Every structure is written in structure tokens, then in C-alpha cells.
Amino acid sequence: EELMASSHYGEHFARHWLDVARYADSAGFANDYARPNAWRYRDYVVRSFNNDKPYDRFVKEQVAGDEMDPDNPENLVATGFLRMGPWEQTGMSVFKETRQMWLDDVTDSVGQTFLAHAMQCAKCHDHKFDPVPTRDYYGMMAVFSTTQFAERKASFLPSESKLGFAGFRSLTQSKIAGYERQKKELAQKINRLKKAETGSAKVGDNGLDPGDEASQSRIFKNLIRHRIELDRIEPVTHSVFTGKTVSMKNVQGRLKMPQDPWGKGYLDPDVIYDGGSVYSQGDAVKPGGLSAAESLGGMEARSFPAGRGKRRLALAEWMVSEKNPLAARVMVNRIWSWHFGLGIAGN
């Protein structure tokens, strides 16, 4: 009781949950851009443990908080869970492939986090002794096919600390101003060299020092990184929304939510990808959960909404159903393991 009454209790067990949720302050890959608002999801998890939030609500907020109540900032912050995996879209990336990488990641992560079952073994084909067939894998993926990225406006909560915001803003803006000066000075130097070396020639050696070219690239990236960092103290959160998919070429910084989520774009096909290849469409599937859980728990097969329906909310409600044999026992096993070092079930 003494330990659970401590505010550090939530911090300690949030660390375990954040490991499961693949929490990261940056997006990974080559650019590894910062996620300046990720701290809000981290603090949400700490608060949830300290406030004894009911587990069913904890699950629903993270998987479908925006579909439950988009006007509740806490719900929007919670959906940061869906974006914690590594992701990058550069000018050299094929959006169709990076989109599929995220769909694979979120499908597998939801399966492992809430149902204790790795899903990606079923991505390419069925396995004789695996209770998750390929059709179930792509059925669960279809739940997320209308889920899109956005940094959404979410007012700061009274429980969120804003200490140090003013100092952070001042420091970051001074760094940006410094890089802007360097950028201007280097641009002037490059222009002088171009005129001196090439004159009015249209083709030829530009006369630039390779070091100057490298500096130009470095300054440009530093400007991007520090402008992104300023979002850390803005009332926005790393979140999602339900709508059509819009192709993106090069993502740097904040992704804004469209006024009409169902206006521009296209609907991802809800199909089995033969061999796991996004370029090889197979049979159509419907959004759904795991058939093995339904048969083991004696659950009635649930019909999930398609089209513009709230697919993620349907999945979250299916997972926390009292008849679902997996979700509750998975969390009990995690908590037991985190307290005593060994789970009730060793796997």
C-alpha cells in the first residue's frame, strides 16, 4: 500500500508499459526526427497508473480515444500509442511502402501489447500450428486502414507540468536565429564564389568548397530539427484521425489534420497481400478481431464497421469485452511479472 500510494509508483510501472508500447522520443531511421510531443503520451501513462484508471478505459483511450471523444485532450494524447513505432517518409521513400510498414507495425503491436500474440508470423501465409491465420492478420489490419497521422490540437491539462516552457522557447529560438545567420552568411559566400569562378557561364565547375556544401546541408537540417522542437511547448499532440489516406512525399515536422478527413485521398484496400507484398493484392477481408479468441472464449463473432465507421473503437471494445479470454489475463500477467519478476504464465 505504501508503494502504491507513492507518485513514483506510476513512474516505475509506466517504464514497463512504455517498453511494451515501443515508446520513443524520435522517429528512427536515417533522419531520426524528434517527436516533440511524445512526452505527453509518456505522462499520460504515468497518470493512468497513479490514478488507478480502469484497464478497459486505458485500452480504449489508446486504441480509439479520438473515436470515443475527440474533444477530450486526454483521449487525443492517449492515441499517441498508435504512432510510437519507427516511421519515416523522405523524398526517396515510396509512400505505399512506408504506409504499409506502419500498418504492419501497428497491427503487430496491438496484438502483442493487448493480446500477447505476435501477429507478423501470419503476414505472408498460414502456419500449421499458429492460431492466427493470415485472414485474421489482415482483418485486424483493416481496422487501421482508415487511420491517419496528425499532430492534433489538444489543450494542456492542469495535471501536465509546463515548468521550463519559457526558458526552452527562448533557448530554442536563439539557436534558430543563430542557424539563420549562418545560413545567410554561407549563402552570400556561395554566391560570391559562383560569380568569381563561373561568371556568366551556364555550365562548369561551381567552384564551391566541399566543406561549404556540407555546412549548408548541416545548417538546413539543424533549422528543421529546432523548428520541430518548438512543438514541444505547443498545445498539440502526436495523434491520429479517421479518414482517407493522402500520399505524402517528404514529411518534416508537424502533420496537420485536414478540415474534411473524407475529402481528398483514397481508401486503402482491405485485402490479403499475398506473400506480404503490398503490390500483390489477394482476397478481400473485413475488419475484425482474432477468430481464435472468439472460439476459446465462447464469444459471439462480432461484426466490425467498415467504410467510414469507427473501426478502432469496435476493436477496442472487442478486446476489453468480459468474454474476451485474452486481454484481461495478459495485463494481469504483466502486472504480476512487473511486481514479482516472474509472470504467472512464463511466456
Language-model features and meaning:
Residues D66, E74, T79-L82, E151-G343:
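Short, functional "switch" segments adjacent to catalytic/cofactor/reactive centers
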Residues E1-G167, T242, S247-Q252, Y273-D274, ...:
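Short, structured secondary-structure elements
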